[in-house]
C-alpha cells in the first residue's frame, strides 16, 4: 500500500553474497565488480546498495561469531575493510545517487566506535552513509566497561565532508528488531522479549534476524 508523503525505495544487500566475495577474493578488476553491482541494481530495481556487517554474515555461516574490520573471513580470506572499499567505489563510479549505505561491524559491542571509525576510513574519502550510528558509538569505560563514545564519533565525522549518518532513533517500549545482521541477532536472541526469535539465511546471499525486544531507560543498548 502507498503511504502518502513518504518516499520509499529498496536497498539491495551486497557484501555477504558469495558471487561478490568470490570476485574480490580472486582479485577481480574494479570494472568487473562495477558490472555486477550495476546488474544487481537493474535486476532488483533498488535505489541503492547497502552492506550489513560487511563479510560478517557470510563468515557467520562458516561458524565465525565475530569479524572485525581488518580480520579475514575464514572462507574468502578478505576483510570487511576491503569489501567496503570496493563497494563504495562501485557505487560512486556508477553514479548511484545514494552513497553506499553501511551497517558497520560490531553492532552494540563495547568499544565499537573504533571499528566504526575504521569502517569510515575504508571508503578512502568516497561518499558513504552510516546507518543507526548510535549502535556503533560505544566506548568501554566505566565500571561495566560500557560507555558512550558519541563525542569521539561526532568529532571524527564532522571532519569528513562526504559522510552522512542517521541516529537510528529508539523509542522506549515493546518492539521487534529486524535486521540483516544475523550474526548479531543470533548473539542477542537471549534478550528476546517475549522469548521467541527467528534467524535465517536468505538464499545464502544475505541474512535475516527478528528478535522481539523491550527497550527501557535501564537498557544499555
Language-model region placement:
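Short glycine/serine/threonine/alanine-rich loop segments
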Residues: 6, 96-98, 162-163
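Conserved, mostly hydrophobic/aromatic
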Residues: 8, 103
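Metal-associated gating/positioning segment near the N- to mid-region
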Residues: 1-4
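Active-site mouth loops of central-metabolism enzymes
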Residues: 9-34, 75-77
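Short, surface-exposed connector motifs at secondary-structure boundaries
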Residues: 93-101, 127-128
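Active-site neighborhoods of metal-dependent hydrolases
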Residues: 29-90, 106-117, 123-221
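A generic structural motif
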Residues: 6-7, 45
Amino acid at each position: 500500500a502507498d503511504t502518502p508523503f513518504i518516499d520509499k525505495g529498496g536497498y539491495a544487500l551486497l557484501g555477504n553474497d558469495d558471487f561478490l566475495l568470490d570476485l574480490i577474493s580472486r582479485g577481480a578488476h574494479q570494472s568487473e565488480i562495477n558490472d555486477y553491482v550495476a546488474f544487481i541494481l537493474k535486476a532488483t530495481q533498488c535505489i541503492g546498495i547497502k552492506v550489513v556487517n560487511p563479510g560478517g554474515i557470510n563468515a557467520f555461516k562458516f561458524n565465525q561469531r565475530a569479524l572485525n574490520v581488518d580480520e579475514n573471513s575464514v572462507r574468502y580470506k578478505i576483510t570487511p575493510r576491503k569489501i567496503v572499499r570496493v563497494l563504495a567505489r562501485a557505487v560512486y563510479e556508477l553514479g548511484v545517487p545514494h552513497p553506499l549505505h553501511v551497517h558497520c561491524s560490531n553492532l552494540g559491542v563495547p568499544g565499537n566506535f573504533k571499528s566504526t571509525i575504521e569502517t569510515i576510513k575504508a571508503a578512502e574519502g568516497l561518499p558513504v552513509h552510516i546507518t543507526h550510528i548510535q549502535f556503533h558509538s560505544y566506548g568501554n569505560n566505566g565500571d561495566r566497561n560500557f560507555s558512550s563514545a558519541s563525542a569521539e564519533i561526532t568529532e571524527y565525522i564532522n571532519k569528513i565532508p562526504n559522510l552522512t549518518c542517521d541516529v537510528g532513533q529508539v523509542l522506549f517500549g515493546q518492539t521487534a528488531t529486524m535486521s540483516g545482521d544475523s550474526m548479531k541477532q543470533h548473539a542477542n536472541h537471549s534478550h528476546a522479549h517475549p522469548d521467541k526469535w527467528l534467524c535465517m539465511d536468505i538464499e545464502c546471499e544475505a541474512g535475516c534476524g527478528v528478535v522481539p525486544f523491550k527497550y527501557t531507560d535501564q537498557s544499555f543498548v
